[in-house]
Every structure is written in structure tokens, then in C-alpha cells.
Amino acid sequence: MMFSKSGLVAVAMLGASAVEAHMKMRQPTPYSDSSLNNSPLAADGSDFPCKLRDNAFVPPSQETIAQIGEVMPLTFTGSATHGGGSCQVSLTTDLKPSKDSKWMVIKSIEGGCPANVDGNMSGGADVPDPFEFNYTIPAGIEPGKYTLAWTWFNRIGNREMYMNCAPITVTAGSSKRDAAPVAEKVEVEKRSANFPAMFVANINGCTTKEGVDIRFPDPGDVVEYDGNPSNLQPAGEAACSGTPAWTVSGGSGSPSTPSTSSSTPAGTSAGVSVSVGATVGATPTAEPESSSSEPAESEGAPGVFAPTSATVFPSTPTASAAPTSSSSGAGSESDSSSSSNGALTGPCSTEGLWNCIDGSSFQRCANGQWTTAQQMAAGTECTVGQNAQFTISATAVKPRMINAMRHRKRAHGGHRHA
């Protein structure tokens, strides 16, 4: 759901619900989930990392298993989304992390995380966040046991840092990818073996600016833009002000000794995608209100989910969801060049503009450049042309296809009982 309200109303919404519900990671399942509350880290950093407390690292009954290159779900519970913000996904080899732990960022989401809304959503602390995200364990990470951290810097409200942690077991990639030519594997690993350190602020003397989706000083290779471009912090502006009393280490790449040894060499999946620059990611799977319609399951482009009817995602919240004419944005990107399949490359001038290519793939103008085209999810199509609003419609999916997708999902659900 996109909220189109004035800033005053957004702040009022924030104040009304922030007391009763913040946000909490749902997938992957966190450590000590029963004792994990949805509040931010302490302002003095005393519970960093992972909201330290008694018995903070009790593993869940279901262990999260992630194959290198596999797209994994990143989902949340709660409604106090504080106008969204920016998030990172990081890994450490420490199974009981401390302030001395080394964190490796594998994905940064700048804007729209954990939801692309003006203020807060309704529903309370136990309502699933309809905006779903994902992450992929990249090449350069060795198989073994890790702690995954989700960190969030909210756009509206008190200057806070949220952090939830979950145990995760990384397994080697598919044999098909492992059999790729040596030169190809070396190039992928070269691009993805250097992971920056986790960004820390609002608990260490360096404070983020309110009202903007921060840009991380070192976001890494995989960066996703899910918010409204007008909210994104200007390029070159510092992510926080003040001198940090402390930071965390990280960034050198795959550790030589993961938390548990494995005789299987590291591999990469056929689905691995090292994205240098902007990508377009999460979209809501449904309206925040409950619906009796079940979205079609998909294995398409990461973060794009199949709605059961036409759905519109505006670049900037508007009171109306009516799509603009497909010609409204056409011709405005005169400096761009077009490939044989209709995808645009090079600079673009209308920040946030969507380009639907043949209904089966799409791209977006982000940071003045056209992103790489991504395939639509199975069972969906977009309205062809350049638009300020992105319209997704469900296509007919045969029952046999749906059953096959459900079978694959059950077979690769990403969990096993510990």
C-alpha cells in the first residue's frame, strides 16, 4: 500500500503507533526469537550487536539453509515502519557476535526498507510487513555457519539503529555453476570477494539526518533502490554527522576458516548475480489489509512478486493509482541508447522513471543511470513503455505450472529442522 498523506499526517501516524510497535525480522528466523523485542538498539550502543541480552543466541528450531547464489527471503513483522529508510544485510563468522566481530556487507537497500510508505502502516506489532525483500549469498563466501544481521536506519522519527541477527548455514553452489570455465569463475569471485564493513550510526556518536533515506558510505557491490527517489540522500553527502566513538571491522572478503569446517569447496550457483550499481527490488506482495486471494508463487526477478490483479507502484506516492500514459516519459531520455531488446543504457534524466520492455522485463532510472533490465516474475507482465508508475498485471498461469512452482518451493524452502 502506498500512503499519500502530508508530512504532518505522517508524523501524527508515527507518534500514534511507534509506542506500540516497531519492526522485527521474520525471515531468516532470528536467534532467541521469543525474547527478541521490536525496539531499536540502545542509544549508547550497549546492546550492540544483535540486541545483546541474557541468552541472546539461542538457535531457532528451524535452521536457515542458504546455497551460494540462491535467492533467500528477507521479511519482517510489525507496522511502525517510520517512513522506511535504508537497510543492510551482513554476515559474520562469529556465532555469538560481539563488538569485535567482523561484519561483511552482502547487500545494501537504500530507501524503501522495510517498507516504502510515508509514515507507519496500521495493524500493530504482530502484522506481517507486506513488503518482501531478498538477499543472495554471493560468490566469495565459503560454505559454513554464519550469523546474518539485518540493520535498519529509519527515515522518520528518532535517530535510531535497528539490528536483528539470525544463524544461517551456507552451502556450496550448484555443480552446474561449479563446472563453469575457470576464467568466468575467477571474474565473478574477483568482483564479489571484497565485502565492506557494516555501517553503524546513531549509537556511537555519529547521527544520521532525519527525513532522508541514507546512502551508505560503502554499500558494496549489490545495491537496491526501493524508495522514492526524492527521499534519497543527495550523492556525496555524509551518511551521518559527528565523530563516531567506535566502528566495526570487516571488508576483506571470504574468511579462510568459517565457523564450521566443510570439505566441500566453495562454489557459486547458476543464479548468482553480482549487481554493481542500482537494482530495483522489493514490491508489496499484497495490500496491508488481509485479502482472500493468494498471490501466485514465482521464481522470476528477485523481489518482484506476482499479484492476482493489476497493481500499480508509483515512483512517488500519489493520491491516485491511475497509470500515466505510456508516452508520458518517452522521449525524455534523449541521451540514452537502446539495445536490440528495447532495454535502455546510459544516462537518464527522470529519476525514478520505469521502463517496461515487451511486458516481460523492466528497468528503472536510478542515480541518473538506467539499471540493468530484470525479468518479470512468472505469471506477471508490466505495461509496456516508460511511466512514472509501474503497473503489474497477472497473466494466466496454468495449474500445472503453479503446482510445479509450489513443488520447487517446498523442495528449496531454505529451512531444515535443527
Curated annotation (Swiss-Prot):
Residues 226-345 are annotated as: Disordered. GO terms for cellular component: extracellular region. Residues 254-345 have a biased composition (Low complexity). Keywords: Carbohydrate metabolism, Cellulose degradation, Copper, Disulfide bond, Glycoprotein, Metal-binding, Monooxygenase, Oxidoreductase, Polysaccharide degradation, Secreted, Signal. Glycans are attached at N120, N134. GO terms for biological process: cellulose catabolic process. Residues 1-21 form the signal peptide. It comes from the Eukaryota. Its EC number is 1.14.99.-. Its main location: secreted. PANTHER family: LYTIC POLYSACCHARIDE MONOOXYGENASE (PTHR36182:SF2), PROTEIN, PUTATIVE (AFU_ORTHOLOGUE AFUA_6G10930)-RELATED (PTHR36182). Lytic polysaccharide monooxygenase (LPMO)-like protein that acts as a strict peroxygenase and does not catalyze a monooxygenase reaction. It is indeed hardly active on chitin, while being very active on soluble oligomers of N-acetylglucosamine. Cleaves the glycosidic bonds byoxidizing the C1 position. Also unable to oxidize cellopentaose. Probably breaks glycosidic bonds in non-polymeric substrates possibly carbohydrates in the cell wall of the fungus or its competitors. This is AA11 family lytic polysaccharide monooxygenase B. It comes from Aspergillus fumigatus (strain ATCC MYA-4609 / CBS 101355 / FGSC A1100 / Af293).
